[in-house]
Design a protein with these regions (language model features):
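Outer-membrane beta-barrel "beta-signal"
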Residues: 55-58, 118, 216, 329-340
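Long, hydrophobic/aromatic-enriched structural stretches that serve as scaffold segments
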Residues: 75-151
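Solvent-exposed loop/turn segments connecting transmembrane beta-strands
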Residues: 44-51, 202-213, 292-296, 320-330
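Transmembrane beta-barrel strands of outer-membrane/channel proteins
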Residues: 32-38, 87-95, 138-144, 184, ...
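Outer membrane beta-barrel transmembrane domains
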Residues: 31, 99-100, 223-340
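Short loop/turn motifs that connect adjacent beta-strands in outer-membrane beta-barrel proteins
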Residues: 22-29, 64-85, 127-135, 188-197, ...
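Bacterial Sec-dependent N-terminal signal peptides
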Residues: 1-26
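Short glycine/proline- and aromatic-enriched beta-strand/turn motifs that initiate or cap beta-hairpins
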Residues: 24-66, 91, 97-100, 261-263, ...
């Protein structure tokens, strides 16, 4: 009896300690994101309304405490046995316009009117021990009039009393968008919990876009480790005990990138559409005359601020021209995240 009683007390103490630790470390499992790309959002106050002019996206990301039963998820790359796997579903609409949206005529030496609407299923798989990740996105959607980009832009411009876009009758034609996008990232260096240096590479394959990209990424500030998973980058579960109150993140991101593009349906038209329109009784091909630039350089920089379950980010993208003979371009992204 003298032996059993101390053992029972020790076991009860251990169970209580484990329960308290679980309460302190319990992680969130859901993240909802509202994501807005717009070239009017500009950190230098020089907004425009041209080229890649808008992208609106809604995402639901989630983790599971058991292997996914969805057969597609089981086939996607995982970052090892100890990986943190974040699944996601997204809906996005994007639009491109030429510089002068008051003209009704086709403008061959500028970006064509184009719109896309698509659903994305994703798996972001992070290995917190070996500091690498695999991120896979499966994209399915449409481009052309079926994407309703013209109606969306016209409605918003009417709502804010801005000039009406007049050239959507010349937009690139209907076409299916099917793509797989894969990203691999690896941490190269870090300093305590304040600085991380990460390298990444991307491959895009499908009817929407074909190409590759490489980039370094630097994060500086008060932040959770990047490879602890996507959700932890934008929120912190409510802590207890000695961890109580540690729910703030504030950090900057710098990410230059070089991209080689082989095809891009939203810039040059899809595989199955001839992109001809009847203009004044003549069949005219309404897509840019000069073709794609193969190599595009860009710089992404901005900041993330997270307080508890809510966070916001602003990222500015400055890019060299995507089409030969046109202009460089800047797009701002403002996103809000709620984690639970």
């Amino acid at each position: 009896m003298r032996t059993i009683l101390p053992m029972l007390l020790l076991l009860a103490s251990q169970l209580l300690t484990n329960k308290q630790l679980y309460a302190q470390q319990q992680e969130d499992t859901r993240l909802f994101r509202v994501y807005e790309d717009n070239d009017f959002l500009n950190i230098r106050g020089k907004g425009t309304d041209e080229a890649y002019t808008n992208g609106t996206r809604f995402d639901l990301f989630y983790t599971k405490n058991h292997p996914s039963s969805f057969v597609v998820d089981r086939k996607l790359p995982h970052a090892g046995d100890s990986s943190i796997n974040v699944f996601g579903w997204s809906l996005m609409q994007v639009m491109f316009t030429p510089q002068d949206i008051t003209k009704t005529t086709f403008q061959p030496d500028d970006y064509a009117y184009a719109g896309g609407l698509f659903v994305t299923h994703s798996l972001y798989s992070y290995n917190p021990e070996k500091k690498y990740s695999y991120q896979t996105e499966l994209l399915l959607g449409v481009m052309g009039p079926m994407a309703l980009a013209g109606q969306a832009q016209t409605f918003v411009h009417h709502l804010i009393h801005y000039k009406k876009p007049m050239g959507w009758d010349n937009q690139l034609g209907d076409d299916p968008l099917i793509n797989i996008n894969f990203t691999a990232e690896k941490q190269f260096a870090s300093y305590q919990k304040w600085i991380e240096v990460i390298g990444g590479g991307q491959v895009f394959y499908g009817t929407a876009m074909n190409g590759v990209a490489v980039y370094p990424m630097v994060r500086i500030g008060i932040m959770h480790p990047y490879f602890n998973g996507y959700l932890s980058q934008y929120g912190t579960a409510k802590q207890k005990g000695e961890h109580k109150g540690h729910r703030v993140q504030a950090y900057i991101i710098v990410k230059p990138e070089a991209q080689v593009t082989f095809t891009n349906a939203l810039l040059e038209g899809g595989l199955f559409s001839d992109n001809t329109h009847d203009i004044s009784g003549k069949e005219v091909v309404t897509k840019p005359a000069n073709g794609l630039r193969t190599i595009v350089y860009s710089a992404n920089y901005g900041a993330v601020v997270a307080l508890g379950n809510f966070s916001m980010s602003f990222i500015q993208n400055s890019s060299s021209p995507w089409i030969k003979g046109v202009y460089s371009h800047e797009v701002g992204n403002f996103s809000m995240y709620f984690v639970w």
